[in-house]
Amino acid sequence: MTSPVRILGIDPGLRRTGWGLITAQGTKLTYGDCGVVTSDGELPLALRLRELFEGIGRIVEAVRPDEVAVEETFVNKDAQATLKLGHARAMALLVPALAGLPVFEYAPNLIKKTVAGSGHAEKVQIQAMVRFLLPKAEFRVADAADALAIAITHASHRDAHALRQAHLPGGKRRSLTGQAAAGQGLAGKGFSAAAAARIEAALAKQG
């Protein structure tokens, strides 16, 4: 039997950074907790980033994950918004890296593909599938649901990174960038094999 792995998903945002904790053991996923870290929009950028840094640090210390997954930056036409998101994402990457945790990154379309079966899935579809895969999940904002989706994605693709783990001198694990490609889905369904296995397992339990 495979050992359980605690995975912290982080959905970066300057105003709200979502986080979600799950435990993965084989194809079984268990909900842990979720929430958001916020920054005061009235403060200067440097102080807002400090709020995110300290807030994410408290979460990492409290939930003690084994691995961390972060959503990659989505570049849009609003350069200023993209830049602000980049600042927030830097905090999401830096905090767990300083804690010696392995950090992986996933593209938004891969997260949607893994969780909902389509790289163009809407937020409501993502939230519905998160609730389906994690029946005990409780979230009030989309940021927390997105963070859980990121954690689920890493649970589905983490084996692809197993041989790429490296260590820094002194025994600290190095933060890695996971540019995982989507696995082959079921014919005509678009789900990855791991995601399909979880859905089938959930259906079997309900049946």
UniProtKB/Swiss-Prot annotation:
InterPro entries: RNaseH-like_sf, RNaseH_sf, X-over_junc_endoDNase_Mg_BS, X-over_junc_endoDNase_RuvC
Signal peptide: none
Binding site for Mg(2+) 1: D11, D143
Major location (coarse): cytoplasm
Listed PROSITE patterns: RUVC
Transit peptide is among the record's keywords: no
CDD domains according to UniProt: RuvC
Residues the record marks as active site: D11, E71, D143
Residues binding Mg(2+) 2, per UniProt: E71
Oligomeric and partner information: Homodimer which binds Holliday junction (HJ) DNA. The HJ becomes 2-fold symmetrical on binding to RuvC with unstacked arms; it has a different conformation from HJ DNA in complex with RuvA. In the full resolvosome a probable DNA-RuvA(4)-RuvB(12)-RuvC(2) complex forms which resolves the HJ.
PANTHER family: CROSSOVER JUNCTION ENDODEOXYRIBONUCLEASE RUVC
Protein name listed in UniProt: Crossover junction endodeoxyribonuclease RuvC
Naturally occurring in which organism (per UniProt): Methylobacterium radiotolerans (strain ATCC 27329 / DSM 1819 / JCM 2831 / NBRC 15690 / NCIMB 10815 / 0-1)
Gene behind this protein: ruvC
